[in-house]
Amino acid sequence: VSVEQLATRNKIASAAYADAQTSVGTGTLSITVNGESFSVDVESGSDSLEAIRAAINDAEDNVGVSASIVNDENGAQLVLTSDNSGVENAIAVSVTTDLADTGDLSQLSYDPNAGSNPMIEKVAALDSIIEVDGFTQTSSDLTVAGMIEGVTFNLSEARPGEKMTVDVSLDTNAVKRAVEGFVQAYNNLNT
């Protein structure tokens, strides 16, 4: 068995702004994850990084993206993180700006298929990849099931190219607990 890669959640970040209260412009952000989209209207007076973060997180139709603000030595950045791991959960952000927009909301756009974007990918959306006896299986999370009948691999660390030996055995304690639970339930029913 070789764990070639672990699934990760996509994370993208804006350029740095002076602070989280900085106005970034007005318009509409359309955020897409796994083929589903939702929109956030950004209006004058609620166009700061803080307000946009809140609008994304509070959107009732949010399709699986969490927004946060990270402050580093360069300033405040809006960070979007996919709620689920895997390639299909890559984040895309398109922007429609208002004609009267004096800011530059388009700096919050991101296309995972484009070579250059205003927002920067901090963590790529990846699937887990496991190899067993020359057979490869991918999974959008850290669990690989069905590759070998009755066996589920719970992945915790990738070691590309490094082969590991896995012993598969029956968990007799789990069987014992299941039988004891059945007997207890049966006895409770008959008393």
Regions found by a protein language model. Give the residues of each.
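Bacterial flagellar/type III secretion structural subunits and associated motility module proteins
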Residues: 1-76, 81-189
